């Protein structure tokens, strides 16, 4: 919102965007909201990228070309990783229980 002083002695100004000519008053504060609007648009873009990240078919916001399926691959490897460690923990517990039940397995 740009303002041009048409007649500073009479306090008359013109809004450049709309072409409206009006009297300038001391009790009214004029604030430019374009920087705020730019920040809101940037936040909306980040929110859209976060929403798109929930669908594994979409690519990340600032990814290089050819990165389709990145989230799908990451989800698969995450499941394999945690599945491996849960299986190992269960295997250790079963081994400990088997040894406690039958001490002859370790030579005692």
Swiss-Prot record:
Disulfide-bond pairs as recorded: none
Enzyme class at the top of the EC tree: translocase
Reaction catalysed by this enzyme: 5-methyl-5,6,7,8-tetrahydromethanopterin + coenzyme M + 2 Na(+)(in) = 5,6,7,8-tetrahydromethanopterin + methyl-coenzyme M + 2 Na(+)(out)
Swiss-Prot/TrEMBL GO biological process terms: methanogenesis, from carbon dioxide; methylation; one-carbon metabolic process
Subcellular location: Cell membrane
Record's bilayer topology term: Single-pass membrane protein
A GO CC term attached to the entry: plasma membrane
A molecular function (GO) term: tetrahydromethanopterin S-methyltransferase activity
Residues passing through the membrane, by range: 77-99
Keywords annotated in UniProt: Cell membrane, Membrane, Methanogenesis, Methyltransferase, One-carbon metabolism, Transferase, Translocase, Transmembrane, Transmembrane helix
Statement: the UniProt record of this protein carries the keyword Nucleus: no
Pathway as given in its UniProt record: One-carbon metabolism; methanogenesis from CO(2); methyl-coenzyme M from 5,10-methylene-5,6,7,8-tetrahydromethanopterin: step 2/2
EC number: 7.2.1.4
Keyword Transmembrane: yes
Its job: Part of a complex that catalyzes the formation of methyl-coenzyme M and tetrahydromethanopterin from coenzyme M and methyl-tetrahydromethanopterin. This is an energy-conserving, sodium-ion translocating step.
Family statement: Belongs to the MtrB family.
Summary of subunit composition and partner proteins: The complex is composed of 8 subunits; MtrA, MtrB, MtrC, MtrD, MtrE, MtrF, MtrG and MtrH.
Protein name: Tetrahydromethanopterin S-methyltransferase subunit B
Organism listed in the record: Methanococcus maripaludis (strain DSM 14266 / JCM 13030 / NBRC 101832 / S2 / LL)
Organism lineage: Archaea, Methanobacteriati, Methanobacteriota, Methanomada group, Methanococci
